[in-house]
């Protein structure tokens, strides 16, 4: 059975079709996730909180583990700007994730001869 990446990033099992190419859709999804490992990302949650941290892993339920995570609360009228709360290692339940934004890598990286 081949794994198919759905729109929200979760995978589901499907039966193989006759017209499959050499690279299965599950392989593409796996490579995409592997390319995001150890990258900084911002996760927006359903309750308005934002978590920023280093992407370490995910599971079949779309839960995400962030390292060196910081929590930012949604600003309110009484407290317009709040300091981030340092969480360290944080697990974000997949059903609470609204959006994920990945930090761009630096344009140039040092080259060694």
From Swiss-Prot:
Region ranges (Disordered): 1-29
Quaternary state and interactors: Component of the N-terminal acetyltransferase C (NatC) complex, which is composed of naa35, naa38 and naa30.
Role according to the record: Auxillary component of the N-terminal acetyltransferase C (NatC) complex which catalyzes acetylation of N-terminal methionine residues.
Residue ranges occupied by any Sm domain in the UniProt entry: 28-106
Record keywords: Cytoplasm
CDD domains, per database record: LSMD1
GO biological process: one example: negative regulation of apoptotic process
Name of the protein described by the UniProt record: N-alpha-acetyltransferase 38-A, NatC auxiliary subunit
InterPro entries per record: LSM_dom_sf, LSMD1_Sm, Sm, Sm_dom_euk/arc, snRNP_SmB/NAA38-like
Alphabetized Pfam families for the sequence: LSM
PANTHER family, sorted: N-ALPHA-ACETYLTRANSFERASE 38, NATC AUXILIARY SUBUNIT, SMALL NUCLEAR RIBONUCLEOPROTEIN-ASSOCIATED PROTEIN B AND N
Family statement: Belongs to the snRNP Sm proteins family.
Transmembrane segments: none
Gene3D superfamilies: 2.30.30.100
GO cellular component, one term: cytoplasm
GO molecular function: RNA binding
Compartments it resides in: Cytoplasm
